[in-house]
Amino acid sequence: MVTLAELLVLLAALLATVSGYFVSIDAHAEECFFERVTSGTKMGLIFEVAEGGFLDIDVEITGPDNKGIYKGDRESSGKYTFAAHMDGTYKFCFSNRMSTMTPKIVMFTIDIGEAPKGQDMETEAHQNKLEEMINELAVAMTAVKHEQEYMEVRERIHRAINDNTNSRVVLWSFFEALVLVAMTLGQIYYLKRFFEVRRVV
């Protein structure tokens, strides 16, 4: 029987394998991150461009044998999951080389799943049902955490767009008010001159 303390330690270990980061990538620059895993381990990359330019970035995932696993150009956000095809270090790169002057801020998470169990370990059919439920709960909690982080990023982006639009509307309204006042003063001056009696001496 598994005790509550063991379950909490297992849950903490499962949640510890997920890390969310913000990274700033300058124009004409590339940032790479590395994860060493064993063959068969499930990995995932979730990313979203939070700030900068057209909110796009180039993404590339490369295996230990320099084999391209995933390549995406000018993506704003994405989610990619795969199983490691061999033991070694996997490379996750974000490139801002297409940008001429705007740095980008990228929020990303690299998920590393459990390593596959060997022949000497007990099979899935004999696993404890409670352990399976905890694994499912950990995965669900991680997914909720990711969604909350990405919703915060999206909310920040939309708030910036709303603030920008609001300031433009206020400036345009102020400009229209000035034009209206100028036209009113011009019409008053014109009508006053129209009804003026000119005396000839």
UniProtKB/Swiss-Prot annotation:
Sections of the chain in a coiled coil: 117-167
Membrane topology field: Single-pass type I membrane protein
This protein's record includes keyword Glycoprotein: no
Residue ranges, annotated region (Interaction with F2RL1): 1-181
Chain segments annotated as transmembrane: 169-189
InterPro entries assigned to the protein according to its UniProt record, in alphabetical order: Emp24-like, GOLD_dom, GOLD_dom_sf
Annotated PROSITE patterns: GOLD
Compartment(s) where it occurs, according to its Swiss-Prot or TrEMBL record: Cytoplasmic vesicle membrane; Cytoplasmic vesicle, COPI-coated vesicle membrane; Golgi apparatus, cis-Golgi network membrane; Golgi apparatus, Golgi stack membrane
Annotated region described as Required for TMED10 and TMED2 cis-Golgi network localization, given as residue ranges: 118-157
Motif (COPII vesicle coat-binding): 194-195
One GO-annotated biological process of the protein: regulation of SREBP signaling pathway
Keywords annotated in UniProt: Coiled coil, Cytoplasmic vesicle, Endoplasmic reticulum, ER-Golgi transport, Golgi apparatus, Membrane, Protein transport, Signal, Transmembrane, Transmembrane helix, Transport
CC per GO annotation: COPI-coated vesicle; COPI-coated vesicle membrane; COPII-coated ER to Golgi transport vesicle; endoplasmic reticulum; endoplasmic reticulum membrane; endoplasmic reticulum-Golgi intermediate compartment; endoplasmic reticulum-Golgi intermediate compartment membrane; ER to Golgi transport vesicle membrane
Domain of life, source organism: Eukaryota
One Pfam family from the record: EMP24_GP25L
Molecular function per GO: frizzled binding; smoothened binding
Topology feature Cytoplasmic, residues: 190-201
Motif range (COPI vesicle coat-binding): 194-201
PANTHER family named in the record: TRANSMEMBRANE EMP24 DOMAIN-CONTAINING PROTEIN
More info: Ectopic expression of TMED2 alone does not result in its proper cis-Golgi network localization. Coexpression of TMED10 is necessary, and coexpression of TMED3 and/or TMED9 is facilitating localization. Down-regulation of TMED10 expression reduces TMED2 protein level.
Function summary: Involved in vesicular protein trafficking. Mainly functions in the early secretory pathway but also in post-Golgi membranes. Thought to act as cargo receptor at the lumenal side for incorporation of secretory cargo molecules into transport vesicles and to be involved in vesicle coat formation at the cytoplasmic side.
Family as reported in the entry's similarity comment: Belongs to the EMP24/GP25L family.
Subunit structure of this chain's protein: Monomer and homodimer in the endoplasmic reticulum, endoplasmic reticulum-Golgi intermediate compartment and Golgi. Probably oligomerizes with other members of the EMP24/GP25L family such as TMED7, TMED9 and TMED10. Interacts (via GOLD domain) with TMED10 (via GOLD domain). Associates with the COPI vesicle coat (coatomer); TMED10:TMED2 heterotetramers are proposed to be involved in coatomer association. Interacts (via C-terminus) with COPG1; the interaction involves dimeric TMED2. Interacts with SEC23A; indicative for an association of TMED2 with the COPII vesicle coat.
The protein's name in its UniProt record: Transmembrane emp24 domain-containing protein 2
Organism: Homo sapiens
Lineage of origin: Eukaryota, Metazoa, Chordata, Craniata, Vertebrata
The encoding gene: TMED2
